[in-house]
Amino acid sequence: MEQFEVKWGIFQGAFPAGQHLQDCFQLTRTNGFAGFELSLETSLPLLPEAYTDSTEGILAIERSVGLDRPRPGGLRFESNMNDLADIKRAAELAGVRIISISTMQLFHYPLSSPIPAIRERAIDIVKKMIDAMVYLGGDLVLVAPGMVTSEVSYQTAWQNARRALQMILPYAAERQIGLGIENIWNKFLLSPLEFVDFIDSFDSPWLGAYFDVANILQYGYPDHWIEDLGNRLKRIHFKDYRQDIGGVAGFTNLLQGDVPWDRVIKALNKINYRGWIVAEVTPYQSAPEQALKDTHSALEAIFSIKELSRSNKSCISNQ
């Protein structure tokens, strides 16, 4: 089978919550990763309209991945140009490229909300990520497309998410920043064909998929999704998931779950994927840096499957 090369990045949540962003950049480089995915956080209280039955659950997830409070030196919704300059300088000094920005804020402020104030905040959040990405030199922001709830029907979620994204897309296109729609546990866009139809309905090269191979295991097969998404795949999250545990507790480190890595790699090769692979893992409670080392080793093992490999030297030089 033909070899192919991809570039490896690491997610901000892979570092302990209290660790300064500058130190995260340094550890990213020293542990062999070329790219870094920032998380947009905030010190602002939630809008009153944002509180729902799922708020406490979302906050619990944020706490579990260290995203429940702003990281020292990190990107915040209220960050100014001086803050962005500090972040950019720290990444450059470490020799790390900031490749994308994600946020948990779109779970509190979904694009699909029927409440105008919530949708407006969601649009502002995505635009904030776009502006930061322009300054920091990356090319993609991760966007949670919305969610279906007991109060928000599937049709309402579809219509509101499309309207919101139609308002954001011209802003992103003008600044040449891609929007990566991620498959999340939102009871929305549950099949690859539906996901493709949603993306294609915008007819824009600036909107595609940010695919998570572990999120999909509850209701699909990652290799099927990768093949169906094809050239719509803008970026991919690697983590693992144990189906025998289930729920949020089922997420685990690479090679310790049920993701069929051989089929994932084969599918990526089939669609000729050459983009970033971002490891979305969490730190160990003790010796947190060891999680970075183990993740790097796991990626080496994954990309040796079926005679597929990539050169770390090439990855680092491909910034």
Regions found by a protein language model. Give the residues of each.
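N-terminal pre-domain/capping segments
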Residues: M1-Y135, Q166, A173, S204, ...
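Acidic/histidine-rich catalytic cores of soluble enzymes
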Residues: F4-W8, D23, F36, T156, ...
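Active-site beta-loop-alpha junctions enriched in small/polar residues
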Residues: F11-F15, S39-S43, T103-L106, G146-V148, ...
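Gly/Pro-rich active-site loop or hairpin
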Residues: Q12, A17-Q19, C24-F25, Y51, ...
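Hydrophobic residues within beta-strands of alpha/beta enzymes
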Residues: F36-E37, I99-I101, V141-L142, I236, ...
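Flexible, glycine- and charge-enriched loops at secondary-structure boundaries
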Residues: F77-N80, L84, I115-R119, I123, ...
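A short helix->loop->beta-strand "cap" motif at the edges of active sites that frequently abuts
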Residues: A94-V96, G138-D139, I177, I271-G275
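Active-site groove signature of glycoside hydrolases
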Residues: Y135-V152, R175-I181
